[in-house]
């Protein structure tokens, strides 16, 4: 998907499960505007492997695509062929959304710093202490009051960044993707201690690896590295965050 400066959304590629938002499962080989969002000014978008999401300038969240595991947040498992508003968040102003990579979870961040999660709950990636999934947005209470400013979803894990520069991760732990120095699963948001004090200002998440940049421009990487995706000239998996320049 692509978002223009005037708030229009275009999508293209494989159309299975209606994830392109064009009211069909047909694929598209060039960018096409999503007609259902033309009357809205969109400010943020996110793509999962089988579902998509968009946030309007007024804080409304829309999702569409595969509905399995409740990943769309509409209270059911129904696939949506066009964008549909997530009514369970209509009392909140949503400012960011993240869709799971190769996965079925979704995260949303509101303007008052609250994080909501829903969809498949395997390995605790929804951040509420268990592995149960849910089909409507539920608050990740562990992150209340810590000033979250960015959220991301990888494959079977989730990440959040606070305004104070702390990185929190949770979910599946193999490939050391969580950055805690262990391959154990973590079912509630937990601070990545090795980055404490480094003032992280932005994070990026792949399917199985993560990057974080500090206010001084240093970049740290951790997780899977089988294709050299950490940029450290090796294919060795990092158990903990490793700085590279």
Regions found by a protein language model. Name each.
Residues 10-28, 66-80, 116, 120-134, ...:
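Short glycine/serine- and acidic-residue-enriched loop/turn motifs that recur at repeat junctions
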Residues 30, 41, 48-51, 82, ...:
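WD40/WD-repeat beta-propeller blade-loop signature
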Residues 1-2, 11, 51-54, 63, ...:
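Conserved core positions of repeat-based scaffolds
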Residues 24, 38, 46, 76-79, ...:
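Conserved loop/turn at the beginning of each blade in beta-propeller domains
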Residues 29, 34-40, 86-92, 138-146, ...:
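Flexible inter-domain hinge/linker segments at boundaries of tandem extracellular adhesion modules
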Residues 8, 56, 60, 100, ...:
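Plant-skewed but cross-kingdom recognition/interaction modules and surfaces
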Residues 4, 15, 48-49, 56, ...:
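Structural signature of WD-repeat beta-propellers
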Residues 2, 32-35, 46, 54, ...:
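Conserved beta-strand position repeated across blades of beta-propeller domains
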């Amino acid at each position: 998907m692509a978002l223009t400066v005037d708030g229009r959304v275009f999508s293209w590629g494989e159309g299975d499960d209606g994830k392109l938002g064009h009211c069909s499962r047909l694929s598209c080989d060039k960018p096409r505007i999503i007609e259902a969002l033309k009357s809205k000014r969109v400010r943020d978008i996110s793509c999962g492997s089988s579902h998509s999401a968009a946030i309007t300038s007024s804080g409304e969240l829309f999702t569409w695509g595969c509905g399995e595991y409740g990943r769309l947040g509409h209270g059911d498992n129904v696939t949506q062929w066009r964008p549909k508003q997530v009514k369970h968040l209509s009392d909140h102003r949503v400012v960011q959304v993240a869709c799971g990579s190769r996965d079925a979870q979704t995260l949303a961040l509101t303007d008052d710093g609250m994080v909501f999660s829903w969809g498949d709950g395997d390995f605790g990636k929804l951040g509420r202490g268990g592995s149960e999934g849910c089909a409507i947005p539920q608050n990740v209470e562990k992150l209340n009051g810590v000033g979250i400013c960015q959220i991301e979803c990888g494959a079977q894990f989730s990440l959040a960044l606070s305004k104070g520069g702390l990185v929190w991760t949770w979910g599946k732990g193999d490939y050391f993707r969580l950055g805690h120095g262990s391959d154990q699963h973590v079912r509630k948001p937990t601070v990545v201690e090795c980055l404490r004090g480094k003032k992280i200002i932005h994070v990026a998440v792949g399917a199985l690896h993560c990057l974080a940049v500090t206010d001084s421009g240093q970049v740290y990487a951790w997780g899977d590295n089988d294709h050299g995706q950490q940029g450290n000239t090796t294919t060795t998996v990092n158990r903990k965050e490793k700085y590279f320049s």
